[in-house]
A protein has these predicted regions:
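Peripheral, non-AAA+ core regions of ATP-driven protein-machinery
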Residues: 3-6, 10-13, 17-79, 86-94, ...
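Conserved RecA-like ASCE P-loop NTPase motor core of nucleic-acid helicases/translocases
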Residues: 119-123
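Conserved Walker A/P-loop ATP-binding site and its immediately adjacent core
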Residues: 124-130
């Protein structure tokens, strides 16, 4: 007798279930997130309870073997993962279409096969011949790498357990199907149940599973928010498709820090690691041009020097235009307001454009002072010396507030050959005197801009 179907509404954000449509989700309070799905009555979930009885174990009895991490052969990826792949982990890799998610995982598979690690690549989007063509294009010619083209979770689970694979790639989670659920691939129910099945396989057999997830136009992984809660690690692949740089950022990691990023560059032969991001981002920077400054952004534990550009010109509109690329728009408006109120600069009749060169996105407030310098430099047509790096957060009272890891940032500037660093006075450290960099300390925005 066939199972009956019924209509259920699910919240796309948190997976909350309701018998009727609601404008606001009672679970996560998000608006207009309910979608209608057909589910079979009686199917409570795809995850089966283990048959064997289990008993609790004391924490001191649990052993963590040194070999529990497997190196991927990519230093930048290992950095984000916390030192390598943990056996039995479930890792979600998200990013925009064409950003390089499948490419980095294929290159990782190649390196793992070289270490005699059994790898299985499962694709629900491409045929085996298409996967092979893409692999050959980026130089992956590994005869021992197993490929599977299927989207049925029952078949995939059977193959995983029989293949003796230690690492499995699922590309992508939105194409996989649990037949018992009875809804279309990519729906909230399917994504949740497929993830639950994969999590059970990973934990039961000690297999590391990487899941590729597509993102929505808002930049979130498509599917319920519970997907990110279920997995062990969430990695986001960021970057501008018009630029070669790619940033792999960890937003969740149960086995390591989330304060790390990996920097790559996209080439014709795939992704290449960037050992010195500061040098790569500053390469080709124009010299002796107003509105251009170098700032230090702390990405995880790694200081990265980037070029910040500003262009200020008279407006032809009643309301001046404010545009920012790679930096928070509201932050730029805040800095402009402080410059008008505390410094006395008349910026109302001028358009202001701020850009982070190289396609980078910066969220560090330590670049505030650099934004102010770039705007003042362009406004007054005065050049900031190309061998000067600027660090500091701007408060609403016009004070320059201290930021974190200034000594580490100054060391990076010294390594890159900079002659001067402008820093907050509260961040001065005697250890900076040993560097080959002149340290200029400032406490207010007026004092800082007087150096221009």
């Amino acid at each position: 007798m066939a199972a009956k179907e019924k209509q259920i509404f699910f919240c796309k954000e948190c997976g909350y279930e309701s018998a009727k449509w609601q404008g606001q989700c009672p679970g996560c309070r998000a608006w207009n997130t309910f979608v209608e799905e057909k589910v079979k009555v009686g199917v409570k979930g795809a995850v089966k309870q283990p048959k064997d009885a289990v008993s609790p174990m004391g924490i001191l009895q649990v052993t963590t073997a040194e070999e529990s991490r497997v190196q991927t052969g990519m230093r930048e990826l290992d950095r984000v993962l916390g030192g390598g792949i943990v056996k039995g982990s479930l890792v979600l890799v998200g990013g925009d279409p064409g950003i390089g998610k499948s490419t980095i995982l294929l290159q990782m598979c190649r390196n793992l096969v070289h270490q005699n690690v059994n790898v299985l690549y499962v694709s629900g989007e491409e045929s085996l011949s298409q996967i092979k063509m893409r692999a050959e294009r980026i130089g992956v010619f590994e005869k021992d790498m197993l490929l599977l083209c299927d989207n049925d979770m029952d078949n995939i689970e059977r193959v995983i357990t029989k293949s003796n694979a230690s690492v499995v790639i699922i590309d992508s989670i939105q194409t996989m199907v649990v037949e018992e659920v009875g809804s279309a691939p990519g729906t909230v129910t399917q994504v949740r149940e497929v993830t639950a099945r994969l999590m059970q396989v990973a934990k039961q057999y000690g297999i590391a599973i990487f899941i590729v997830g597509h993102v929505t136009k808002e930049g979130n992984v498509a599917g319920p928010r519970t997907l990110e809660h279920m997995v062990d690690s969430v990695l986001y692949f960021e970057g501008d498709r018009n630029h070669g740089f790619r940033i792999l950022r960890g937003v969740k990691n149960r086995f390591g820090s989330t304060n790390e990023i990996g920097v790559f560059t996209m080439t014709e032969k795939g992704l290449e690691e960037v050992d010195n991001p500061s040098q790569a981002l500053l390469n080709g920077r124009p010299q002796n041009v107003s509105g251009s400054v170098v700032v230090s952004s702390l990405e995880g534990t790694r200081p990265i020097l980037v070029e910040l550009q500003a262009l200020v010109c008279q407006t032809n509109f009643n309301m001046p235009r404010r545009t920012s690329v790679g930096i928070d728009y509201n932050r730029v408006n805040l800095i402009l307001a402080v410059m008008e109120k505390r410094v006395g600069m008349n910026l109302w009749g001028y358009d202001a454009y701020v850009n982070i060169a190289g396609g980078m996105k910066v969220n560090d407030t330590a670049v505030d002072l650099g934004v102010a310098f770039a705007i003042a430099s362009s406004m007054n047509n005065k050049v900031v010396p190309s061998d000067t790096m600027i660090i500091g957060e701007i408060g609403l009272a016009g004070e320059i507030r201290g930021v974190t890891n200034v000594l580490q940032r100054a060391k990076e500037a010294d390594k890159m050959g900079f002659a001067t660093c402008i820093i907050p006075k509260s961040n001065y450290d005697k250890a900076m005197d040993k560097l080959n960099v002149k340290i200029l300390c400032v406490s207010t925005l007026v004092e800082a801009l007087s150096l221009l």
